[in-house]
Amino acid sequence: VSFAAESYGYAPEEVAARTEKALSLVKLEGKAGTAVYRLSGGQKKLAAIAGVLTLSPELLLLDEPSASLDPKNQRNLLNILRNLPSALLLASHDLDFVYDCCDRVLVLHKGRLVADGPGETVLRDKALLESAELELPLRFQ
């Protein structure tokens, strides 16, 4: 988790503080010294996100961030992302997570943009989603 902050050149005390804060955000406080191979798949994903958060990025690029997370950790990640001052660019097939996380939604199908608008509008449009081979989020079914 501390690798990014160390590589960026922060002083050791700053690295420790940023790492502790990031681990706390993702609810992995007790895992600071744990070998990666001892973490579950979901914990590995959260640890990777924590590592990025040590840099306080202005933009986060996330690919399927909710995949391999149990419902509790999905909610935790959602709360983290909602409260970050960072902009998010998120690729996901989990449209319920997208709805909860994103203000603006773009839908791509076969490499082409087929929709761009507020999540409330785009993710309720059954015909549009079906044309892109997607299903309505569960909350709208």
Segments from the language model and where they lie:
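Conserved ABC ATPase signature
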Residues: 35-39
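A short, surface-exposed alpha-helical micro-motif characterized by mixed small hydrophobic
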Residues: 98-100
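Conserved ABC ATPase "signature" region
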Residues: 13-31
